[in-house]
Amino acid sequence: MKVRLGTIIVIAVLALEASAARPIPRPALAARLAEGPEIIGIVHWGLNTFTDREWGFGNEDPAMLNPAKFDADQIVGACKAGGIGGLVVVAKHHDGFCLWPTKTTEHNITKSPFRGGKGDYVKEMEQACRRAGIKFGVYCSPWDRNSAHYGTEKYVTDVFQQQLRELLSGGYGEIFEMWFDGANGGDGYYGGAREKRKIPGGYYRYDTETFAMVRKLQPNVCIFNEMDEADFRFCGNEQGLVDPDSRSTIGHYDGVWDHYKHVANVGAVDGTTFHPIESDFPLRKGWFYHESERGTTRSAAYLTKLYLSSVGNASTMNIGIAPNKDGLLDADDVKALSGFKTLKDALFAHEVKQGEPFNVVVMREDISKGEQVDEWEFVADGKAILRGKSIGLKRIRVLETPCAAKSCEVKVLKDGGTLQGVSFRLYRADPELVRLVLSATTESGETDTAKWMTAEQSK
């Protein structure tokens, strides 16, 4: 099959063998993939921010949660200015401290000075997201190093699942994504026991009860987890790096993480579930704010490179946001996010027609019947200048040297048998910008983005 810009022309290229039907997206997931957002964030703020830890032990004093200038609109506004279309708010981390007035534990925000003991951080963040016009999601850690009941059935039914009910039906509106990670026990306070606790496989009842409960309470929610029943999967690293030929389909999760992590970043042509990647990474060195990590904020250029690695390889991009002790996003972080949007938008600001020089190619596959493309070439004036295995939702490729071909096409060399169509668009970006982005590293310093700002951005 050859695909030309705006037109699909089918010709006999290969005698394709019939293959089994590919897994297709679930309804909620299909809508999410079609409508976005393709860039989201996950906000880590809480007692860990004040103890200078990544993981709290579970015995931290709630009195420490006393920000001087907490402003949800400042945090959310900076994220929106960075092109983020949805935020997953950490409502409870592994320390077990709940940032909303839960009835499941005394270890919650009402025992802190925040808003005079009457505050609700989750609600403030939710309302700020609604005001900004971006989507709102939640993460509630399954591991709870504070709860004396952790490791028992009572914890799952009366604490964890009940906390989910409060968050999903307790007045926080529509939840676009519910995050579940692989936090599976270890040492902790556990009500004063100060011991190590292990849990058996299936302890959280994700596949038998918990996910079904979540979907019943929030029919349009998308779930992030490695289990087959979830919608989005972990990319296998926390650097935002996705394999250039990654697929949204993947095989059954057997519960053995060492097996899964090797295939999570790539997927499988013969995968049994449609389970696209969400690539999460912290904007700074750590997920929570640490004063000692000033200067580690990813540069705008490197964030743009990670966009190409994630969204450009059919993944959702998830940026870790870490407000400081004052309850604000640091100026360095605000600037990096804003600069990222400037550079990203500049890459795609000038769409061109065939025959005009281009250096950015964006390919899309109609995945209504699953991900079908197994091998492709991008051909310019009869010569293959790009090659790959997968296309899927979106595949972005950037050329170091502009191409001025008169005729371009995507040649599908192999597919799953029910290919619905492939389209592509061409863009011409400033070669200096392309070099800046492609050469960016984690060590890249602050990026000067003024040259690529629009008139609106430069105000």
Where are these regions (language model features)?
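Mature catalytic domains of secreted/periplasmic carbohydrate-active enzymes
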Residues: 21-430, 434-452, 456-458
